[in-house]
Amino acid sequence: MVDPVVRIRRLTYRYPSAARDSLAGLGLDVEPGEFVVLAGRSGSGKTTLLRACCGLVPHYHGGDVAGAIEAAGLDVRDHGPADLGAAVGLVAQDPETQVVSTTVRAELELPLEMRSESAAARARAVEEVALALAMPHLLDRTVDTLSGGELQRVALAAALVGRPRLVLLDEPTSQLDPVAGDELIGLLRRLNEEWGTAIVLAEHRLERCLAAADRAIAMADGRIAFDGSPREFLRWALDHDPALATPGARLFELAGIGPPPVGVKEARQMLRHRGLEPIEASGQPPLQPSTRAGGPALVAGDAWVELDDGTGPRDVLRGIEARVECGERVALMGRNGAGKTTLLRAAAGRLRPARGRVAAPGGCALLPQSPGDLFVRERVGDELPGEAGTAALEAVGLDWAAAADPRDLSGGERQRLALAIVMAGRGAEGVLPGLICLDEPTRGLDRARKDTLVAWAKDLSARDAAVLIATHDTEFAASFAERVVLLGDGEVIADGPVAEVLAGGWYFATEVARILGASGAILPERGAEILRELSVRRAEVTEAR
């Protein structure tokens, strides 16, 4: 009998200075070749479990640990990340903290050099993993010129280049555009099916990955709350924690259709079987700039921004024309490297266009893509002193973490801390900027925390501040935005109402939009109304016969 690639017995762990256990008596086996999805709310223990499986807990983070854990046949309490590195690959939630080399090629060669691979073997492995992740064009780039999504691809490639027995991934699609995210899940499925690589993938956006998994585990308060098949998990989530259910599962639940579908393909097949034919998608997304008259919060006029990516200068923004009105809520979307972060940095005055202009007449506050850029203290409470800080911590659900080190928080908790810092800073200044820019703020956030972010954005909007959020999260954009601006190659390629843009695209579309085609529905609530209407019509036709 083959031993599990991960074996955990009664594992309890607490970070230094933490007030509570992050893992509490947890037991788990992962078999060779399994594809396991870890679900759970922010702070439920997913990140800590992955850190324990690769030795970062306790060897890097310290803290108190009890129980037993083995990974790839090694006792993790006696063997740290260096010993486990050949057999266990990790993609952390914050790739900027994981990438250590100057160039992309050097980063990918590093794990192979540590195993004394020959130059020829290193070259072949690097070329193959770069092709698999569609990133040969990045190999000679310097890492400090990469976008967040590009950096995440590099971290993925470095984890996969040595073909480990076990790959641990902590929200690996959080900074990837929908195309790259789908490609990644396809690659993981191929590694799993063709090479027998065990995959443990922690995700909040489960609609992307459940169909590829053999098994789904839900965590809560450092324990396993559910362990079963993806379909059983969706049924459990709808009954016990609907925030964990996929949009497609919520769509079917609201429409009174069961069982919940695992993925878009299965959902469409189930609807066809019931005679509820999805409407086929039509056309391209619109180009309809805003006509809202509230005064400009952001104006970009023929703006060109040039950056040196390590291989020479290139135009990141190419004569961009864009306008955001006061009080608007706008989602800025586009593939990795399309220019989203560059536009936000230009709006905040951190980059100057070579020609043209980008201006925020009422001022601009920016939450950067890397939340760690905002942390300068060793305690969460010290990052947010005073009444405004306490209120901001309570608003994001981190009041319990005042004594913790920001570095010990999960990725979602760090993201929430960064949001709290921006919220508290705005309150302390007493002046509301005309434009609030957030760069990928939903990374690591569960649905409940995303709802909190949406409520905060709507409050700012009601006070006449524009909120511009760069995001790859189409489900969040559908809930947050009134309008979507879609960038491609530094130019605006679509600009219009959120329902039109996110219902009309192939990749930049919500799960409900992909299930129901060109119906115009992008959220489960409206989609369920359409399905109920179709059911009534079908019943009427059947009765008439």
Where are these predicted regions, by residue range?
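Conserved ABC ATPase "signature" region
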Residues: 120-138, 389-401, 424
